[in-house]
Every structure is written in C-alpha cells, then in structure tokens.
Amino acid sequence: MVPDYAARVVAEDRLGEVRVIGGADASSTRFDPDRAVHAALVALSWPGLDRLGQAGAVKRGGLPYIPGLLGFREVPALLDAWEALAPRPGLVLVDGHGLAHPRGLGIASLLGVVLDVPTIGVAKSILVGEVEGPLGEAAGAQAPLVWQGRQIGVAIRLRRGANPVFVSVGHRVSLPTALGWVARTGRGYRLPEPTRLAHLAAAEVRRGADGGAG
C-alpha cells in the first residue's frame, strides 16, 4: 500500500498560477481509545494571505498509531475538511513531512497524491536525516537536510532566534519551489502563515470536539 502511493509522488513543478494558498494541520493522541483525529484546512488569498475560508473535521475510529504511517491515520480527517473547504487552494502547505520520511511518504505527500493537489511539507521536527552545516540565527537562514547521502529537505529559520522548520517536497512541487513558497509566506512567526493558521484552526476543532474544554 505505501509503495504504491510513494511511487505516485511527483517531485517536480506541476502547479499552475496560485491565487489561493492553503494550510493543513491534523493532530491525534497516541493512546486515545477513540482514535480521534482533529483536522483543519484554511484557504488564504495570495499574495495578501487574507483568510478566505476555513473548514475542520473530526474523525474517530481510524487506524491505530503505527510509527511511520501517521499520514494514513490523519489524512482521512483532512479529506473531510477538504470537502467542506471553499475556495479550494491551488497549493497546500501541510504541517508535517513530505519526502523527508523513512518511507518517502509523509502526510504532505500522501495528502497531495490522494487529492492530486500540489503540497509542501512543513515540519517542526526532524523525522529522519540531519541538518548539514551551520544554520545561522537570522531569519531566512537555511541548511540542507540530508539522509543516506541525499538531500531530502531544507531547514529554514523564518524568525530570528526561533527554531527552524523543515521543508520537503509534498507532491507536484520541486524542493526549490517548496522552499521559496515557505520563505515567502513567513510573517514573523516560527511557522509560515498557512500552517500557523491551520494549526490554530485545528486547535479550535479540538476544543469544539471536547465541548469547549481547554
């Protein structure tokens, strides 16, 4: 199953003019007996990054937690949110990895392949590989993320002194293009604006599912 999806990932630019850019975020708790996934997507104007739409979804009873297969657990909830989202983005930045994944199929790549939409992985931590060379403290500082002798992503710092994010190809974008979009959508926070707003939206979904607690 995983190799079939991984073989369909396109790591080159096949995207049109982007007028609406999306952000996607999903979260689940490892030991939750309900196996609930809380997901959200936002649609933002480009280049203004004004919020045009937002949709959330909760999916219960999915796959158990399996290391390396988290995308298969969380993507179904993102698909439900996608169905409710308007307008539809021409490019989606996903909170999580794309090709920077031990199976070459992180959540950003899986979502992109299933929807056949250009996606970019924007992760907050490293799953595999190491950052090679120095990574400066200034906003915009970059260094390659390398695994098994090949570059699988780029670490970039969007805010001076903040922890970097780790950018990788999701689907239908090249790594240079992915990096360019992440850099251009930074607005002074650690995360690029699409995934930052998607993270906040997913937190709203979780609070709503919990009856407003937290």
Per-range role (PLM):
Residues M1-V9, V75, D80, G133-G214:
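C-terminal binding/interaction regions
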Residues A7-E17:
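A short acidic-Thr-Gly-centered motif at the start of a beta-strand
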Residues R19-R30:
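Two-metal-ion RNase H-like nuclease active-site motif
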Residues A24, V94-D95, G121-A123:
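Short beta-strand segments
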Residues P64-L69, V94-P102, A162-V169:
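Flexible, glycine/proline-enriched loop segments at strand-loop-helix junctions
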Residues L78-L111, L115-V117:
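Catalytic-site beta-strand/loop segments enriched in glycine and acidic/polar residues
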